[in-house]
């Protein structure tokens, strides 16, 4: 995955409150998405901006800010966003969604972690296994 640095930024009249100053020394994050129309959205750093029609690129200082913006983009029915980490050396690392499928969606190749093969109503009664030597999460 490559990041096109020529992608236009959303129109934003405010500032990031100094968030990106430290990002120039350490690392910063970029989120890209495609919008079907110009519309106003809330910035994770405060204030609002106008996303451009077509491709958009926004630099943020924290990955959490990118994830917060991605949650908001999904309310606009925008699901093609990508999050990148950019190091001061210029190296770009693709972060999210890692295997091309969002974490809450089912991917045939993805193995489930910490899943139970039954619904929560079928959990054993903790009192019945209390002194059996088996922990409740292993039963």
UniProtKB/Swiss-Prot annotation:
Keyword Membrane: yes
Chief localization: plastid
Signal peptide stretch: none
Record localization: Plastid, Chloroplast thylakoid membrane
Keywords: Chloroplast, Membrane, Photosynthesis, Photosystem I, Plastid, Thylakoid
Gene Ontology CC entries for this record: chloroplast thylakoid membrane; photosystem I reaction center
GO biological process entries: photosynthesis
Membrane topology of the entry: Peripheral membrane protein
Tagged with keyword Phosphoprotein: no
Xref: InterPro entries: PsaD, PsaD_sf
Cystine pairs: none
Family designation: Belongs to the PsaD family.
Protein purpose: PsaD can form complexes with ferredoxin and ferredoxin-oxidoreductase in photosystem I (PS I) reaction center.
Full protein name: Photosystem I reaction center subunit II
Organism in which the protein naturally occurs: Skeletonema costatum (Marine centric diatom)
